[in-house]
Regions:
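Conserved NAD(P)H cofactor-binding loop of Rossmann-fold oxidoreductase domains
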Residues: 103-118
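Canonical Rossmann dinucleotide-binding motif of NAD(H)/NADP(H)-dependent dehydrogenases/reductases
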Residues: 10-45
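Hydrophobic positions on the long internal alpha-helix
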Residues: 86, 101, 144-148
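Amphipathic alpha-helical dimer-interface segment in Rossmann-like NAD(P)H-dependent oxidoreductases
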Residues: 92, 132-156
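Conserved glycine-rich Rossmann-like NAD(P)H-binding loop of the short-chain dehydrogenase/reductase
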Residues: 42-56
Length: 167
């Protein structure tokens, strides 16, 4: 049984009626972020570059939460046109964005089939790998913050931007 004090604390984290967009949402951390936000009552918009992986993530989350609370959108965070398109789609659907979780990243260290990769060592890291890391992790967060942050600020209610960084 939850104590009265605990209920008071948890009520401060009530996200019912709020929407949160998560980039890189089909990965492990993205799904964990989505699960936590759903537990607090938010609707989550999962974005990533693979519809197949997004659908798998939605199916997994829908085992514990109502599927209508999980929206999926294909979006490449390195392409501003993709981000603007998703922003416009959400507006057309009447979904106000309250929270942005910039979570998209490239993880060169582990491959699900091969395990730890030698190419993840700095001395073996190629310039192309470096540029991809920067484009997804930093430029992607910048572009998403610019587009979605502007949208959150435009109605006067604001919002929250959470940047996840591990590189």
């Amino acid at each position: 049984m939850i104590s009265k004090e605990s209920k008071m604390v948890f009520s401060k984290f009530n996200l019912e009626g709020k929407s949160a967009l998560i980039t890189g949402a089909s990965g492990l951390l993205g799904q964990q972020h989505a699960h936590a936000l759903l537990e607090l009552g938010a609707t989550v918009i999962l974005t990533d570059i693979s519809m197949e992986r997004l659908q798998l993530a939605k199916d997994k989350l829908s085992q514990s939460f109502r599927s209508e609370l999980v929206v999926i959108k294909v979006m490449d965070v390195t392409k501003k046109d993709d981000i603007v398109s998703v922003s416009e789609e959400l507006a057309d659907q009447g979904l106000r964005l309250d929270i942005l979780v910039n979570n998209a990243a490239i993880d060169p260290k582990v491959d699900k089939d091969e395990g730890l990769k030698e190419s993840s060592r700095l001395e073996n890291f190629t310039l192309d790998q470096w540029n991809l890391q920067i484009n997804v992790g930093l430029t992607g967060a910048f572009l998403c913050s610019q587009v979605f942050g502007s949208r959150m600020a435009s109605d006067g209610r604001g919002g929250v931007i959470i940047n996840i960084a591990s590189d």
